[in-house]
Amino acid sequence: MPASAVISIVDDDDSVRVATNNLLRSRGYVVHTFASAEEFLASANLDETSCVIADVQMSAMSGLDLLTEMRAKGRAAPFIFITAYPDENIRVRAMKAGAACFLAKPFAVHRLIECLEAALEAGRSEAGT
């Protein structure tokens, strides 16, 4: 049910944030965007986030470091990683760390939506709702 899902997009590329924001809003999701992992961690949106879509490589804190930090804070929101530099070692690390999906930019819209729906469903199942 998209209306209740809050998606946080964390990417240092403004064009990716805007395009992904527009796509998800058009599908009924509530979306918050952040230019860095640090900006997201400092926000009031941690507890309401249903899923995080994060770039792997950002200028300061990476998406993988963000996932580690979120888990250390007890936040279990699913993560979808997107990257312009797909690397098999990083993909394996991301999936072992608990990522729901790992997508190379540019990604097909339907693939992102499939990943998001699966991640949200898995998150609801884990929460028992």
List each model region and its residues.
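Alpha4 helix (beta4-alpha4-beta5 surface) of REC/receiver domains from two-component response regulators
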Residues: 65, 86-101
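The C-terminal output helix
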Residues: 117-129
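Acidic catalytic/metal-coordinating carboxylates
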Residues: 35-36, 62-65
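Two-component/phosphorelay signaling modules centered on CheY-like receiver
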Residues: 14-32, 119
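Active-site beta3 strand of CheY-like receiver
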Residues: 47-53
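Active-site residues of response regulator receiver
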Residues: 55, 83
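C-terminal output helix
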Residues: 88-89, 107-117
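The feature encodes the CheY-like receiver
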Residues: 17, 59, 87
